[in-house]
Structure formats: structure tokens, C-alpha cells
């Protein structure tokens, strides 16, 4: 008989430990583990972590088996793991209706429960009686389901369960924008049931999504139908938000020890090694004690000062928990595992020794890990005075199974029984390893042979869309529809993935669908519902952004491939040459670099072997040959009747998968290019006619299916020109001189409404006026009046032969102004028609997810409305309309700016540093004011000029303002594109002699306002007559420069800088932490009557985002941005006084009073130097001298000089005598 090896003996010891501390509690029926002897409920998160030691021990036995009994032991342990994981699966699958609802609502009431009955798998508390929404719990289950399946365990048994897991993927993929209650189930640390965005949830969701992608849940016994699919763009959304949050944990927690599970085992969710180390150091520095780590600062759980009879805390009560937070040995187990995975033996040894010292010996000397260590009630004051000196006592669960399991797992790995690769078979531990450089492959395709010839003349050789066959080219919208059928299961009433826009990572792959290769064009080319895609420069900008994004975020096997089609809209007016912006972009891509990205252009067929290709197995046909039963009626009567137009109800989400399947079937069956060789025989007579009818039916049906899936430019994707939808024309008169029309944009338009004998508006006469006018602006204004007075569906009877509703006429007019790129009218009509801004709600969510609150409309409240949580599209647009006070153009411009802000947030998040609230109304006002200041024009003219900027010019102007650089605006004297307005050149100060490269992009903005001076149309010098109606195009932003005379270019520089910083809410680095210190030495800060009380420091810590937002809410009561910035400077001076070793600097400090004292000191000194009243004119709104606004912060006459004197004067009774003497 073979003797037992030493390793076998050690494993037997661990097996006894696991049995005595974990498995003895496992329910024999459900496999679930109760939280403790007292708490019989089974928490999802605790169960998953608690079973890891069992899983690890099973792997160790499998690896180190000395005899058959060891193999049997390994199997027994592994089946205990499977039993628990399936028990949790049964708990969740019983709530399948909640999974379905949550995909669309993201509501806390629709979330899966966090805990279940250990014996029955049933729920134990109501939906609203617990903080159930804990995305990290669902995510950690999915993560280890993937890891365990990859290690060889067979947990999922049926395709129904596969579909349920696929829907759990949809459940967690929106974690980056979903506020939940977090790993500690409390949400906001005030414990008042307020959900918030948690880094621990976002990070764990990212890890789970990456682990499950392309994983076969049946393991080696699986097939195409058991594979899980994850969209890469959702993963990258999570990564972006996670990076913006860390090292913070949430809005209310500046650091949290739970982040160890995100930056290290098990998630390994962060790719930036420096951010990983920074986060770990923050935890060690701020949370580590003698017995473990606190969960987060001011955590009251089980402290002597916590009232066990109250569920929630009072906000000011949190200060009582400072320095006496309970310490959890659990987190030292994470440090041990982190040391093992990183190969840091010294760290492993250090924390093992520390952990051994806090373990409690149970019966027979079994080491038990307590839940936490607390300060004894009678020694609280002593701990307050000298933190980390009082000996603490163990409290809570014993053992804490979560911690006990990780302790055993860490010991197994530290002793070499398990290698990192065995517990991490999906290799997540390599997340911080540098990735190879990405080369973006770009395939340029021509829509037609004519465009191909034009490109060839320019030295650019491409294929047409028809020539790339058998590869199919489709718009991104189709891919979104295809994915909407993923995870569908009628028996479980699961609808699949909610329809969402497809990101650039998704469209940069090739797809194998039914043994055919598909490529999808980028989403921004498919944005025909909104006007951004009408601007070729904007298309180039979005392409540049996507290429840069791909280079930094691509993590898949193979290279990304972008299919970039060139359509007729990308040609010049005459259609004989390519737009200069598009041509320049194509040449740069051919050179190998564009937008900082390495690019390789070539044929699509050449990229097949190097591209990332995904097999969409869920679209594969079933046994009958097709995924869905289909019945095409191809007879002539069917075509003649026109019923084919109503075959599919595109509004029904439930049938969306059927529609896509039918569309793809028809596409594959009927759009193959016909051979060019002459046929050997030719049908004649009736046969030939029936064949033609058959082809016509096929193509018409295919076009219809495409249109019902909202595919624009159908002819661009189908190899036929037989059927192109023609928009009905109502023959509104074109302008006889379109260029002159374009050159004279209307700033203020008056419509003289015709009246009948009773004094009512004569609508027939108004329609006749519409028919006779050739002015596009006047046509738009008349249609707006008809829209508001009669409604969009009113039939104007413009022509007797057919209906001509107001909506139809506006749509036709929108097409006309779109062709000539009249951006002011495009925005105006878009606002009237309420055209949907593509991904507006997603843009808003992206900004909010980066902890940026938004406001729309101009201050003060209630006109300025704050957006602090994601809103549905309809609610968001309604809020913007209300804040815009009915001005359609301002409303649509607000939405446009929100989209641009989200673009910059995604590519250049550094632009938004130290900005916690983006005030879009003020940003637009500053844009208009800058135009007014630099062009010496009125506010109304500047507003009209702003409205006439092309989208690309608007986006670049926004970048200048966000970047904080000094820039100038001037009219260009050079003629520009005849289509559009004169150029307004926007450049950085001092960049006159810049190189050609520097003059492009950010350094030189060429926009398209008209080539003549701004002037008004139809503005009579007389007062407005009673029959005159003003249209919303007359709206403008107030400007301080309406009557400003020309002045030296340097004059006004500092006032402009303060206005920009104030509008953007930009503050100095560390400003909020300094305000926190000031509040500790006074009773509060008063700004325009609103008080920021010192009690906030008892609730919030200096580094909390929540505190920063609280300070912002007080400062934002000030409507004038430059005045707000002076108040910020005054508070900065107070922070310097707060550093002095004195107990108090006053009671409630009125900050605006300090500013006015400084203003008086400034005026006195300037008068003694001979300044007259004209030079010392005051701003009527704030009473501050405009010259003080324009003073530099430093220097003898700097604002800080006067503010320092004023602050010392204001608080002098609290200051030491020596300080006062310095005045």
C-alpha cells in the first residue's frame, strides 16, 4: 500500500477545515449556504465567494491526486460547487420576469433580489424592503460561472438556461450607467436608501462581460447555440466609467476597500497598472488599521455609536463614526491573493502574518476568521483622540464564510497547491499587460461606378459595394436589429437584447451570418434622421474620433476593420469631384496615419484573414433550413395589390427578430450579382414577362423590408437602381437666386399675418403667400405659424390634386435647405419637426456616468433645469424644450451641444477636469458672446451667426472654449464655399505665424456663416404693427457687448477668461477640499443669500464628489459667470486664511460682501490715480467695476491683492494682531 504524500496530508487538513467551516452549512436540497447560524438567508454574493475555497480545493485534489480516493474527493467537492451555482441559478431563474423588465427600466423595483430562502430558493423580503439592486452580486456570479465552466465544471444544462444567462448579460451590460446599492447594500453612505453609481459594480460587470464573451456554457460538449455573445462597446463603456471613477468608489465614498476585488482578484478589471497601484495605495493609506481595513470612511456599521434601532443615519451623524470605523480582516485575504497573482512573495508573507494574528481559534484549534473588529464602547473617546491605538474586539459572524473561503483559497495558492492559471483559466490576471499596437484597417467603397471613377481620377483606387460580393455591406442599424433577436426565448417570455445603437467596436468586426460574411458601416454614416451627417466635415471629425477610439480601446483578436462608403452626398455641388474634406481624409488614410491612428487602406477581401470575425450562431438556420418559417407570395396579383407594403409591422418589438431573419433570408436569396456572360437561351413571351415580374417582386419586397427596418439609402446597400424611393414634391418655389438667399441669413423675421373681415387670421391667404414666396426663410416662418396654429397634420390644399400637410411641406423644405447646407434653417426646421437627435439620451447618460451633472437653459432656476439622473428620450427632450422657453432653435442647439460634449468626454476626458456641472445654456451664451465681442456685432447678430455655424465648426468652437485657451474670432475676407456662409476664423492668440499643420484642426477653425456682414431682414424702423408676429428665430442670448466700442485686443482678456471659467464651472485643482477646510473654521459660507453650512463637513469627507456637487449648487445661484468666478477667487483667499493656526475665522461668512469690499478698495485706489467715472463703469447686474473683472489675479492691481485685503478686513476680529497689521 502506497504511503500518503506530505502534500496529500496537507490537502486532507484543508478538506477538514473546509468541511467544518463551510460545507457543513450547505443545504442538502438547494445547495445554498446561509449567512450564519442566526441569519438563514442566502446572499448571492456571499454564496459565490464562500464556495471558492471548495472549488479551489477540488482543483488541488484533481491536480495532486495520490490515489483513487483523492479523485473521488475532487469530484465530490466539484459537485458541491455545481450544486450551489445551480441553486443560485434556480433562485434567479424564478425571477425571469424581473430580468426582462429591468433590461428596459433599470428600475430598483425590477431588479433581481439580493438574498433568497436557503431551503426553498424563494424570495424573503419585498421588492421595496431591501436594497436588492446589487449589480456586483449578479456580475460576480456570472464571472465565476465563466471561470468554473472554463475549468471543466458543467453547470448549465439546457438551452433555456443558456438564454437566461444571455439575458443576465443584458441585465448587467448597462452597469456603467445604473445606480445601485453596491456591495454593502446601502447605496449612499448616509444609509438612507439612495442608490448611486458604484465603481465596484461597474468593475465587476466589466469583468463578467469580458469573461463570458464567446464562451460555450456547455464546455467541450457544446455547440453554436450554447455560446454567449457580448458587445464589445458595452465593455468599453464600463471601462471608461471605471477609469473615471477610480480611485473614488462612488459619489459619496472617496475610497472603498471593496475596490480590491476590482483592481485585483477576482475581476482584474483595470488595464492601467498605475491606476491599479494608486487605488491600492489609497486603500492602504486611508482605510488600513491593525485588524484589517475599514470598508469606507465614516462607516457606522456595528460601531458603538450606531443606533441598532434605526435603519438610517442622520447626515450630521456620520462625523461620529470617524476614526472608530470597524476593521475587516476580510480585506487582508484580498491582499494575500493579490500578492500571489502579482508574484509579490513579500506582500503575501506580510499579510499572512498579520492575518494569523487576528484569527480566532475555534473548537479543536480550527482557525476562524471573524467578520470584523470593533472599538469597545467604553474606549471610544480614547480611540477618537489617538486612532488605531485601542485594542478592538471581534464582532459579527464567526466564521465570516466569505472571508474564511478567501483565506483558505489564498493559503492553497501560497503553498503551491494551486497555480494562478488554474483558478483563473480565462487569464484575467493579464489585464495590465501592454497590448500590441493597433492598426485600423479601412476599406473605402464607392456607392456607384461614377464615384469610383471620380476617386480613380484622384489616385484613389476602390471597389464598389456591388464588387465586394460575396461580402455583404449593410448599415449599422441592421446589426442592432440582428442583435435584438439574441437571447429570445418565447417559453420564458424573454425578448432578447433591447434595441440600441451599435458602437464603433461592434461595426469594426466582420460577421459570419449563415455562412455569409457581413460588414457593417459605422453608425455615424447611418444618422440620416439628424443633420450631423449632412456636414462632410463632421463626418470626417467623427471618423477621426472613431479611429482614435479604436486605437486606444481595441482588445479583440485580429485588427479592427472599418468599411467607409463614399456616397453622392460626399461630392461637391456639381457632383463631378469629391468634397475637399473627404478627399483630404482619404489621402491621409492612404498615407498610413489619420487622427493619431495607424491606418491601412485596402480591399475588403484582403482584410478577411487579418480582421476580427464573429460567428453569430444564434442566426443560424434550424433543421428546416431557416430560423423562422417564411411564406413568400410571389404571384403577380400579390404585387399588383400593393399588400407587400404592409407585410411587416415594424413597430412591433416582439416580431423584430422575425423581420430581421426574413430580411436576411431575402437579402441572401435575391441580391447576388448576376453573371455578366450572355445567357445561352432567352425566355420570351409570357415566361419572360413573368420572370421580370418575379424579379420586380423580389426587389420591391426587399426594399420594403429594408425600409421597415429604417435603413436609409437602400440603393447604397442593394445592387440595383430599379427602385429608389422618391419623395413627393409639392413644388414650393425655389429661390431664383439661391446664393443670395444663403448670403443673407435672417436674424429677426416679421410675418405680417393676413386677416379676414372678422379680424381672424386668413389661412387661405397665408397659404397663398407660402405658394408665391421664393424665400426659404419666409417659407419656413409661414409653415411654423401654420404648425403652431393649425397643427402638423393640417392639409394646406396647396395643390388640389393631392394632400399637402404642414408636416409634409416642412419635410420637403428640410430636404431643400439640407442640400444647400443652410445650417440656421436646418436647425430651425429640425426643431419644428422635433427630429430625433441620434443617441441624445445615450450622450446624456455618458456625461452623467462620468459624474458630471448637466443643466439646460439659462440661469437662474427655475428656468435653468438640472439633469442629475438618466432620463428617457421623450422626458429629456421635453425638459430641454421647457428650459428653452419654446425657442425651437435653442432647443435643438442644446441637444447638439450635449452630443458634442459626450464626444469629447469619450475621447478627451481631461478637458472636464475639476468640472462637476456642465451648464449648457451658459456655454451657448458664451459662444454667442465671444462672436459678439470679436466681430463687434449685437447679441442678436451673434446668435444668428452661431446658429449658422456648421456642425463641425460648432464642435470646434466648443473645443476652444472647453480647452481654456485664449482664442480670437474674426471674419475671413477670403471667399469660401459658395454653398455656405463666410467664414469666421477662430484661432488661438499668437498663432498668426503658425505652420500649415498647426493652422488646421483646433488651431484654425473655418466655419460657414454667410460671406457678407450680418444684417437683419424685414426689420422696419417703425414699431411692430398689431398684425405682425415674431417667430422664434428672433431669440438671442444676452451679450455684454451690444454697444461696446472697439478697444485694444488685450483689453477684456481677463474678463473673457473669467466668463469662460465661470460658465464652465471650472475651479482650481483642490478647490473643494480647501472649501471643506474653510467650513471647519466657520459656521458656513453665504453666497447671494444661500448658505453652505459647516454641518456638511460632518456628513461628507473632503474628497467626495457629493461634497463638490453640494458646493456647486450654492455657487450656481449666481447667474453671471464672471461674477461667480470672482466669488471663487474670494473663497480661495479664505482658504489661505483658514490655514492659519486659529480656531475660527467667523460665523457665517458672506462671500459676496468680501467681493464688494474688494471692489470698493479697487475704486478708491483707481480714483486716487486719476481714473474717471467712465473708466470705472460698473456692471449694472452685480455692481462690480468692469475694470476689476478685467484685472489679472496677481500683481499690484490684481484681484487677489484687493480680495486678500477685503477678506482680512471682514474677518479681522478673529485674526491674530500681526496678521491684521499687514493690511
UniProtKB/Swiss-Prot annotation:
Calmodulin-binding as annotated region, ranges: 810-840, 1046-1086
Amino acid composition bias (Low complexity), ranges on this chain: 1023-1039
Lipidation feature positions (S-farnesyl cysteine): 1220
Location in or out of the cell: Cell membrane
Domain of life the protein comes from: Eukaryota
Job description of the protein: Phosphorylase b kinase catalyzes the phosphorylation of serine in certain substrates, including troponin I. The alpha chain may bind calmodulin.
Protein name in the entry: Phosphorylase b kinase regulatory subunit alpha, skeletal muscle isoform
Organism encoding this protein: Homo sapiens (Human)
